[in-house]
Amino acid sequence: MDWSCYSTVIPYNYLLNPDGIILPYGSIIKNVENIEKLFGNKIFIKPNSPWKAFTGFSTSLDNLFYELNSITQLEKVNKSELTLISSHKQIDNTEFRFWCINEEIITYAPYTWQHNEVYSELPEDAIHFVYQILSYLYEYTDNGIVIDIVNTPNGLKLIELNALSTSGWYRGMDVDRLLKKLKEW
């Protein structure tokens, strides 16, 4: 689900990037001065779409041209690709993915982008937080949805929503339970 869609139904205090703006990928460099006025020198960029034209990343504005040029060459990103730009946020190294069907959490697993990282334990209020998110998504959850959350200095935050069919699986998830629910579904 596009950030521009779910950010309109999820309360802003639940979102990791509530301050985000949307720009076409090809317009980012032309808007560096405006981006700096809004967010300072360190920003986060990711595709608006869950189809992942590229992986989201944080960067300084000093490195922005290099980062975008690298992505353009490696990923062949279309200049019209809508892109979320927001301020950089401090987050835990461990993120949590929840696979949900019909407003029910089927399974979850931790994941991290850091090599040799020891996973954090699931925060005590994480399951309640995900059910709160699901309550705002009642129009969308009958299709199955994946919810990624992370702990921050300001509490749990929603990183993004994705489809079951476009999301990776991680060690620790209950694959058998998910497959059984998918078969019943």
Q: Locations of the language-model features?
A:
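Active-site nucleotide/adenylate-binding loops and adjacent lid/helix of ATP-dependent enzymes
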Residues: M1-L137
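Short, flexible loop/turn elements at secondary-structure junctions
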Residues: S49, K89-Q90, N151-P153, N162-S165
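A short beta-strand motif that forms the metal-chelation/ATP-contact edge
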Residues: W99-C100, T107, G155-W169
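A long amphipathic alpha-helix within ATP-dependent nucleotide-binding catalytic cores
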Residues: A109-L158, R177-W185
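Acidic, proline/glycine-rich low-complexity IDRs
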Residues: N143, G168-M173
